[in-house]
């Protein structure tokens, strides 16, 4: 990275910024937090095998169905893998946080006041139909998303004044007001659409045929709703870029769809697909047996990791009147007996989720630090009192299944919230309405973990109905916020990033990421402060912990559990690098061993 003073250079692309007073930073990497790990001349990432062969086929299983190939559509269920058809301007490795290296973009220049940024497009960049990727395509992509993309996109990038092709291979982003995070985000992760393909199509609508992509894999076969097969392109333009060395090692990738997870597991054991990451503790403990295991054809591994954990829970839609009171939400947390479930259903494999930054230094523990208090004290009148006086912990039982003490606490909280028990039915004192709600699910395995909660809620006089729908209906109801409760997960947060705006800020209340429907001025303030302080790691630490505390004590979900290992079973034909990336299992770095494959039954070679 180097700084250069802008001057009048005739026909150079810096002409537009010649009179600016800010310095210009020229670089090949963009890092949201800290310094980039890899130098400008790096050859490959540390967690890949640069000599990995490009060979063989891998098949994965998916639950449900799909009906189109447009990952960006506002309705429908896109095919598995369709989101990877397009390369992004830059690429983020799995062993760093928010650092991006050249892919479609080969070089970046920006003013150090973050009012503008220019990207040079790699002259070799091509779409899968052979046509070059140009700055016009980048300009088109931004405008397409701003006019036809989801509302959250328009809101997130409203500070972007323009994205303009100033040269066939140079695009300039200008901000209406300087904003480092939005400027970098747009430059880093934009997946570039081919203008010649999309200009007469609506981005918001489903796509019945595979689009023209730019990534390493292209759709070569599909049966809508049942399977889709991608093939590695022999003439993929970016195969030798440092970000791709040692990656994309399967010649074909196929996704097959199954009715539910139980059927899919049996198909895996029978040899219908190759790799399965297990989410069910019961299946992992008791179902991975049989002839193919005895013969050594299938390998079962628990791979330990220290990656940040997702925040999984039964999520309340607090836009629903029944869940608008925090006391009601807290009361229901006492109805989940994690200790009994872990012992009797999960074979003691899990730890209890308690944080939105689980397994990171940003997890709020103990009482607020001095720096946290500096942030939180001015907001004291708008924050639950216990943020300042207690460390949050989910309710704990003795694991016996007898939770009378916990239910007594729940009864008291419900009473304080205006509810009373009448003829064994929890009833609102003013309205006379019975306490009932619906848990929306799409998987039988989710129903299994919901039933114990349902039974305990029944003891409180609360009727939780479990409503199972197919994946298409589920996605529609999620987008429409047509649900009372979901069993869902907030993605793992390795650090407090600007993405937290979309997840928690009220400006993005319509985002499907804001599962709970949170609209809280304190949460707004904290997420906006986090977005504004990305250059200051010392400020992000107390801000992240402060946000964690506020979210914890508002009881937006009934916390479930997490696992500090990857549970994965494979038909034993794969090899992987000796180093695993810190933040991912790294399946895109695995390869098929021709020698090992020959030892397997023919359909799994």
Please provide the spans of the model-predicted regions.
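Aromatic- and charge-enriched surface segment that lines or borders ligand/interaction sites
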Residues: 48-53, 73-79, 107-151, 166, ...
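N-terminal lobe/hinge region of extracytoplasmic solute-binding protein
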Residues: 23-113, 120, 143, 212
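Extracellular/periplasmic solute-recognition and catalytic clefts
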Residues: 162-165, 220-231, 256-320, 327-331, ...
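Gly/Pro-rich hinge or "lid" segments in bacterial periplasmic/extracellular proteins
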Residues: 65, 85-96, 143, 187-247, ...
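Surface-exposed binding/hinge segments that line
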Residues: 154-199, 214-223, 368-381, 579
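A structural "hinge/loop" feature
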Residues: 26, 44, 64-80, 104-106, ...
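Detector for C-terminal structural segments
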Residues: 24-29, 62-64, 77-80, 84, ...
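Aromatic-rich, solvent-exposed beta-strand/loop patch
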Residues: 102-106, 128, 133, 174-193, ...
């Amino acid at each position: 990275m180097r700084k250069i003073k802008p001057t009048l250079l005739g026909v150079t692309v810096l002409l537009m910024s010649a009179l600016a007073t800010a310095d210009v930073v020229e670089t090949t990497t963009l890092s949201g937090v800290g310094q980039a790990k890899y130098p400008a001349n790096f050859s490959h990432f540390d967690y890949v095998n640069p000599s990995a062969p490009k060979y063989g086929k891998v098949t994965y299983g998916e639950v449900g169905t799909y009906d189109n190939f447009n990952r960006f559509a506002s309705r429908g269920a896109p095919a598995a893998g369709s989101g990877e058809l397009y390369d992004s301007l830059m690429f983020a490795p799995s062993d760093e946080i928010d650092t991006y290296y050249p892919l479609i973009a080969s070089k970046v220049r920006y003013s150090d006041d973050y009012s503008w940024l220019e990207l040079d497009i790699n002259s070799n960049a091509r779409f899968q139909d052979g046509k070059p990727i140009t700055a016009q395509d980048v300009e088109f992509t931004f405008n397409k998303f701003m006019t036809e993309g989801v509302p959250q996109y328009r809101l997130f990038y409203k500070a972007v004044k323009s994205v303009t092709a100033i040269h066939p291979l140079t695009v300039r982003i200008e901000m209406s007001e300087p904003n480092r995070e939005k400027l970098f985000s747009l430059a880093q992760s934009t997946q570039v659409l081919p203008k010649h393909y999309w200009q007469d199509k609506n981005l918001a609508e489903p796509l019945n045929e595979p689009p023209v992509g730019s990534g390493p894999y292209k759709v070569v076969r599909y049966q809508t709703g049942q399977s889709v097969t991608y093939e590695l392109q022999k003439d993929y333009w970016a195969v030798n870029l440092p970000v791709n060395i040692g990656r994309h090692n399967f010649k074909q990738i196929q996704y097959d769809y199954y009715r539910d997870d139980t059927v899919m597991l049996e198909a895996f054991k029978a040899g219908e697909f190759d790799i399965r990451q297990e989410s069910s503790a019961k299946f992992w403990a008791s179902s991975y047996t049989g002839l193919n295991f005895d013969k050594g054809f299938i390998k079962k591994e628990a791979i330990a990791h220290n990656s940040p954990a997702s925040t999984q829970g039964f999520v309340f839609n607090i836009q629903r009147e029944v869940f608008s009171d925090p006391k009601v939400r807290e009361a229901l947390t006492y109805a989940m007996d994690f200790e009994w479930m872990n012992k009797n259903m999960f074979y003691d494999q899990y730890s209890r989720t308690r944080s939105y930054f689980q397994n990171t230094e940003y997890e709020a523990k103990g009482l607020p630090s001095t720096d946290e208090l500096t942030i939180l004290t001015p907001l004291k009148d708008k924050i639950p009192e216990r943020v300042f006086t207690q460390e949050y912990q989910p309710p704990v039982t003795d694991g016996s299944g007898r939770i009378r003490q916990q239910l007594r606490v729940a009864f008291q909280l419900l009473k304080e919230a205006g509810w009373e028990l009448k003829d064994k039915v929890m009833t609102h004192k003013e309205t006379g309405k019975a306490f009932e709600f619906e848990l929306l699910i799409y998987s039988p395995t989710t129903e299994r973990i919901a039933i114990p909660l349902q039974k305990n809620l029944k003891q409180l006089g609360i009727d939780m109905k479990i409503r199972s729908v197919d994946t298409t209906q589920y996605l529609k109801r999620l987008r429409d916020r047509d649900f009372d409760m979901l069993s869902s997960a907030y993605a793992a947060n390795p650090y407090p990033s600007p993405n937290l705006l979309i997840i928690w800020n009220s400006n993005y209340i319509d985002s499907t990421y804001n599962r709970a429907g949170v609209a809280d001025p304190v949460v707004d303030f904290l997420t906006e402060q986090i977005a504004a302080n990305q250059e200051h790691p010392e400020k992000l630490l107390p801000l992240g912990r402060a946000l964690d505390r506020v979210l914890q004590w508002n009881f937006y979900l009934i916390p479930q559990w997490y696992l500090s290992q990857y549970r994965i079973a494979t038909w034993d034909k794969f090899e992987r690098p000796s180093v695993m990336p810190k933040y991912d299992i790294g399946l895109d770095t695995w390869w098929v061993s021709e020698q090992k494959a020959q030892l397997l039954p023919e359909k799994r070679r």
